[in-house]
Amino acid sequence: MFYQDPFDVIIIGGGHAGTEAAMAAARMGQQTLLLTHNIDTLGQMSCNPAIGGIGKGHLVKEVDALGGLMAKAIDQAGIQFRILNASKGPAVRATRAQADRVLYRQAVRTALENQPNLMIFQQAVEDLIVENDSVVGAVTQMGLKFRAKAVVLTVGTFLDGKIHIGLDNYSGGRAGDPPSIPLSRRLRELPLRVSRLKTGTPPRIDARTIDFSVLAQQHGDNPMPVFSFMGNASQHPQQVPCYITHTNEKTHDVIRNNLDRSPMYAGVIEGIGPRYCPSIEDKVMRFADRNQHQIFLEPEGLTSNEIYPNGISTSLPFDVQMQIVRSMQGMENAKIVRPGYAIEYDFFDPRDLKPTLESKFIHGLFFAGQINGTTGYEEAAAQGLLAGLNAARLSADKEGWAPARSQAYLGVLVDDLCTLGTKEPYRMFTSRAEYRLMLREDNADLRLTEMGRELGLVDDERWARFNEKLENIERERQRLKSTWVTPSAESADEVNAHLTTPLSREASGEDLLRRPEMTYAQLTSLAAFAPALEDEQAAEQVEIQVKYEGYIARQQDEIEKQLRNENTLLPATLDYRQVSGLSNEVIAKLNDHKPASIGQASRISGVTPAAISILLVWLKKQGMLRRSA
C-alpha cells in the first residue's frame, strides 16, 4: 500500500549524512521524510567518539556556515575541545572535539524532531520505485510505499554489510544492527558500478580496569574552542582529559604471531581498508621499523565507563585482542566490553554521480556518505548536506548547486570523488586543496553563508549574526587604517616596546598589525589603538586579513586565472572520438568519466595539458565554448 501523502524528498538512513540531508531539505521548505531502521540510533557515532581534526574540522565549519547541524550538536556534546596545529598558520589550524556519544545523539535527535517540514519514520527500506529511469519512491520492509520527487541514499556501511572478528564473520550493518541485504540487491540491478570497501573499529575497554595513574594526560585547550559560528563555550558540558599509552615490542609480537588468524591477511576480507586509519595489524606490518605506536585512550562519555582506544582498530580474534590490550602500559588488567571488528560493505562508484551528487543514470536519485567511498562522520555530513539541498532543489524544479574547489573543502571533496573516484575509503586532508590559504576554518562563513542564504539554508538568526560580523570587521579595519602614530608621538614609546625595530616613520594600526611580532590583542592593548573588538570572531578575521593580505590577494589572482578554463562546460553527450588529435587513452578516459567541465577533465589521470588545449580549441571551433556562472 502507498502512504497517504507524497513527499518532496525521501532520505534513507539516519546517520551523519542522512541527518544533514534531511535537515537541509526541510530547511529549504520541502516536505521531507527520513526513513531509518531505528529512531534511537539517529546521529549514532558508530566508531570514534570525536568530531573534527585536520581537514575534517574545515568540513564541519563549512556545514555550519550553510546552516547545518553537526557543529551545533558537538558544541552541546563535546567533552574536550582542542585546536590542532595551533602553532602553524591559520590555513591548517583545525578544531577537534571529543564527544559524549549519548549527548551527541540526543542533540541530533532533538534538532530533527523540532525541524518543520520533516517527518521521521522507523522502517528499513528494501526497494526503490524506479519508473522510466527516474526514482519516484521507496518501499519499506513491511511493504509500505512512499512517493517522492527525489530520494537520497545515506546508508553507511549497511549495504550487504559483513562483520569480521578473526576468521568468523556474520551479516551486520554495524555491531548490534542488521544489514540491508534486499536494498543492496536492488541497487545492484540498476546501471551502477559497485565494489566493496572495508573499515574497522577497536575494542572498547572498561575504564575501571585501567591504571590511569601511570599514563600521561592530555587536556583540552583553555579557553575552550567553539565549533559553530553561532555557538559559545558556555554550551559545552563538563570537560575531561584523555590519556596516552603506547604499543610495544610485546604488542607487535602478539600481532605478528597471529596474522594467520587475521581475516585481512588470510584473504577472507576482499574490501580495501582506509589508508589513513589502518588497523593495528596493518600498522605493525607496514611500519616494521617502528617499535611503538601512540594510543589515545578516549572517554566515550560522562556517564559511561567505556574507553575508546584510538589507534588499535582490529579484526583479530577476541583472545588476541585481549593480549594486545593487556600488553600496553596501564592496561595490564584491562577488560574488553565490546570486541573490535572489521566490516565490509557495498559502495558505488562516485564517478557515476554529478557534482550535485545526483546519479547520472537514475533521475532524482542522490548518494551521500560512505556509499560514495568516503570514511568519516565529517565527510558524510558534508555530502549529506549537499545531496539534501540538491534533492530539495530538484523537487522544486530548480538547478542544482555545488561549490567549486576554490570555494570550499566540500567542493574539493565532491570534485575528487566525481572526477577521480576512489579505490579506498577517502578522507579529507588540507593537503588535498590547492587553495588552502583561502579555505580556512575561520572564514567558512565568509565563503559560504551568503550562498546558504540564497539557497534557503540559512535562517534569520544566523543571517543577522553574519551581517553583524561583517560590519564589525569592516568598521574595525577602517578604524585601524585611519588611526596613526608618529615616531615623535607620546604613544610611540609604548608602541616601540612591542616592536623588534622601532618606528622610523608614521604608521597606521594596519601597518603595525602587518608586522609579524604584533598581534591584534597586543595592538589593541595600547592606548592609541584601544579598544579591542568584543566580537572575537570578527577580531580574528581582522588580524588574519591584515597579516595575510598580500598572500591572499596573490592566491585570489591564481584562482581567477584558473577559473577561466575550470568552468568551461563539456557537453554530457559528447563522444570524444569526434575530437581529432586526442590519443586513444585520453578518448577512453573522457568517455568513461564524462567530465562536466574542463576543470574536471584536467584532473583525470592521463588527461594531459596538451589534450585540454585540443579540447578548448575544438569547443571554440564548434561554437560550444560556454562557461558556468
Curated annotation (Swiss-Prot):
GO molecular function list: flavin adenine dinucleotide binding
Record InterPro entries: FAD/NAD-bd_sf (IPR036188), GIDA_C_N (IPR049312), MnmG (IPR004416), MnmG-rel (IPR002218), MnmG-rel_CS (IPR020595), MnmG_C (IPR026904), MnmG_C_subdom (IPR047001), MnmG_C_subdom_sf (IPR044920)
Binding-site positions, FAD: G13, G14, G15, H16, A17, G18, V125, S180, Q370
TM stretches of this protein: none
Gene3D superfamilies assigned: FAD/NAD(P)-binding domain, GidA associated domain, C-terminal subdomain, tRNA uridine 5-carboxymethylaminomethyl modification enzyme MnmG/GidA
PANTHER family: GLUCOSE INHIBITED DIVISION PROTEIN A, PROTEIN MTO1 HOMOLOG, MITOCHONDRIAL
Binding positions for NAD(+) per the UniProt entry: 273-287
Thylakoid is among the record's keywords: no
Keywords: Cytoplasm, FAD, Flavoprotein, NAD, tRNA processing
Pfam families: GIDA, GIDA_C_1st, SAM_GIDA_C
Obligatory cofactor(s): FAD
Signal peptide boundaries: none
Localisation: Cytoplasm
Name of this chain's protein: tRNA uridine 5-carboxymethylaminomethyl modification enzyme MnmG
Entry's Gene Ontology BP terms: tRNA methylation; tRNA wobble uridine modification
Protein's UniProt keywords contain Secreted: no
NCBIfam families, sorted: mnmG_gidA (TIGR00136)
